[in-house]
Regions:
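Extracytoplasmic electron-transfer domains, predominantly the class I c-type cytochrome c fold
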Residues: 30-37, 42-45, 55-136, 151
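Short cysteine clusters
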Residues: 48-51
Length: 152
């Protein structure tokens, strides 16, 4: 999560308790590093930045992925878990990445890039990791604009 830091005048990441990721909370450092490496490699081989932005780099055609893990749409009360029928944020994100054409969310549809289940798991881990970086308030007002789903 993020909370407002009055001194810095923007929201900063708050690292919470250990939580399960794809049903596990016992990843070794080596396993976690391999998963992150797979996700970064998948983001490069699938050319995610041809459409998306990450840390200010890339294109502006599709949503900014810098804090995708924290996007309210993926939270338990958000629309994407219900839309995908998955019970956790990471499962919903992985399902969407593997079958984007089944879940129309914006006026611009994400193409099916042939992302495998393992690549999707790595991509979700990579996006979760990226969301934990203190970006000094960038992107501004992230997650506060309501009604961005379904092209509204």
């Amino acid at each position: 999560t993020y909370e407002m830091n009055a001194k810095r005048q923007h929201e900063v990441p708050v690292i919470g308790e250990k939580e399960k990721f794809f049903g596990r909370d016992d990843y070794s450092e080596e396993e976690a590093a391999q998963l992150l490496h797979l996700g970064k490699l998948a983001s490069q081989t699938k050319n995610c930045m041809n459409c998306h932005t990450l840390l200010g780099n890339g294109a502006y055609y599709a949503p900014d992925l810098t804090k995708a893990w924290l996007d309210p749409a993926w939270q338990a009360e958000g629309s994407m878990q219900a839309l995908t029928g998955k019970s956790t944020k990471e499962e919903a994100m992985a399902e969407f990445l593997q079958h984007p054409s089944q879940y129309p969310t914006h006026s611009r549809m994400m193409p099916n890039l042939g992302i495998t289940a393992e690549e999707a798991k790595g991509l979700v881990a990579f996006l979760k990791h990226m969301s934990s970086i203190d970006t000094n308030g960038f992107p501004r007002n992230f997650g506060k604009i309501q009604g961005a789903v379904n092209g509204k």
